[in-house]
């Protein structure tokens, strides 16, 4: 998921607009086959054939390991990921899930109560983060009157590990570095390196002029994939929503 603050599904009006555009493309052909239809849909521009957003922040780094999973943030996308694991793996237990939290604002953790593998005995959930009281924040989210099932009632083994942005770590074969980011309450970006490939996860971060060209450039340098907060237009990030803790595609 990539949606900020709240999950948002595609609306019926948006679906209708996409279908109308497909019909418009079809009308340009004198005759049409099923193969033509599939080709039109697959080659149509992104806004017509696909969608983005929907769930809040949750990203899997998939290196093919079906026993140890690397997950970045626990937004509502974690529910879909858990359902995928339950549907597509023959063995549902004895799996380890490493979940790295950028910060504990609600949209980055509120998928965890709906993560099915966390309810299965034999699974192990390790949650990493730099913020103090990481475990307490997860417990509070699942306390009465907010949620009926407490964190302790989830049957998988759960472990919380506090990291430091001053240290480097080796976890599940990844060399991991962390950087502090400008966001209300602070957020943290992560760099993952394995087999000569580098992924940077940097969400919920505002980059002002004074940090451009500083440690962030080195942190991002040589990334094979960079996941970057580009929520705002340049005008929003510089004026209307300055100091809200987010960035723009222009700065990316």
Summary of predicted features, one role per range:
Residues 1-200, 210-211:
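Binuclear metal-dependent hydrolase catalytic cores
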Residues 202-204:
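DG-centered beta-turn motif at the end of beta-strands
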């Amino acid at each position: 998921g990539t949606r900020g603050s709240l999950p948002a599904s595609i609306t019926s009006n948006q679906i209708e607009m996409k279908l109308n555009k497909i019909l418009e493309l079809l009308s340009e052909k004198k005759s049409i086959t099923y193969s033509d239809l599939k080709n039109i849909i697959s080659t149509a521009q992104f806004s017509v054939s696909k969608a983005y957003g929907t769930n809040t922040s949750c990203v899997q780094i998939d290196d093919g390991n079906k026993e140890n999973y690397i997950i970045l943030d626990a937004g509502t996308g974690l529910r879909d990921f858990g359902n995928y694991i339950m549907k597509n793996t023959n063995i549902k237990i004895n799996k380890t899930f490493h979940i790295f939290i950028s910060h504990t604002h609600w949209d980055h953790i509120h998928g965890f109560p709906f993560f099915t593998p966390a309810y299965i005995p034999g699974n192990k959930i390790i949650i990493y983060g730099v913020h103090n009281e990481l475990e307490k924040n997860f417990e509070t989210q699942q306390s009465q009157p907010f949620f009926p099932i407490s964190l302790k009632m989830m049957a998988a083994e759960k472990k919380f590990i506090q990291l430091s942005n001053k240290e480097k770590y080796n976890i599940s074969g990844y060399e991991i570095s962390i950087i502090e980011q400008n966001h209300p309450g602070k957020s943290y970006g992560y760099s993952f390196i394995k087999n000569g490939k580098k992924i940077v996860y940097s969400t919920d971060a505002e980059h002002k002029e004074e940090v451009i060209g500083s440690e962030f450039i080195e942190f991002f340098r040589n990334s094979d994939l960079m996941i970057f907060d580009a929520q705002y237009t340049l005008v929003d990030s510089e004026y209307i929503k300055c100091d809200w803790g987010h960035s723009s595609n222009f700065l990316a």
